[in-house]
Amino acid sequence: MTPIQGEWKIDAIGLPPQVLRKIYFDNAHRLLVRSLPAPEIKAVRIGRDIKLTGDLRAAAWDNAPVAHLDYALRDGAVHQSVATTVRVLWSDKYLYLGYEGPFSRLNVFRPAWLDKERAGLWDRDVVEAFIGTDPGNPLHYTEFEVAPTGEKLDLDIHLPGKSLEWQSGFQAATVVHQGRSTWTTEMRIPLSALSKDKPVVGTRWRLNLYRHDLDHHAFLAWSPTANDTAHTPEKFGYLIFGP
């Protein structure tokens, strides 16, 4: 066998796309997770509010950019089997978030509490949004969670404390699509609950998006925090209010 000398490389000819992604992107992402730039997503403005159906069937969702939740919060490891997408819309009154992700088996509280909030909802399968609107106080932000059962929870965070008594008035609708093993949810959050200053086109808020999936031991993050907690506001990405 001829020894390898000088510069050399591995050609990617014939390798399937998922292998190429792992070699060239996922491994690099994991290695660089502590120094990656903050991601950005632009919310699309809608002229009229949409009805919450839970299944993202309103036409407005089709035009919204997509945030991808592919990576583990702690170390940036890829979890493609439960990769989740999030779309963002806004109107004069509300911020809308639409989540979609696959599942193998749902882990939820039974019976579901649909008329009151459950502290510890995050200990089962949920999707989450953490939203910071005050650049002068990054330790203050709000947290929103929705479970596949339709249970929901909102919290006002002032690190290191949190208020479960706070009520934002946010609404959510959820659909579990058993036939294709996915679940979807739509959140509608009053802008007035997020900031006293109404956003305009170009406004930038801090945002991170998460998903817990116990069956796959996955805690996914849009912007991985590179530690064991989602409550790391310096690692939040940016929500930009677009036209």
Each language-model region and where it sits:
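Structural preference for beta-rich elements and adjacent junctions enriched in aromatics
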Residues: 37-243
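Mid-to-C-terminal alpha-helical segments outside catalytic/metal-binding sites
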Residues: 1-37
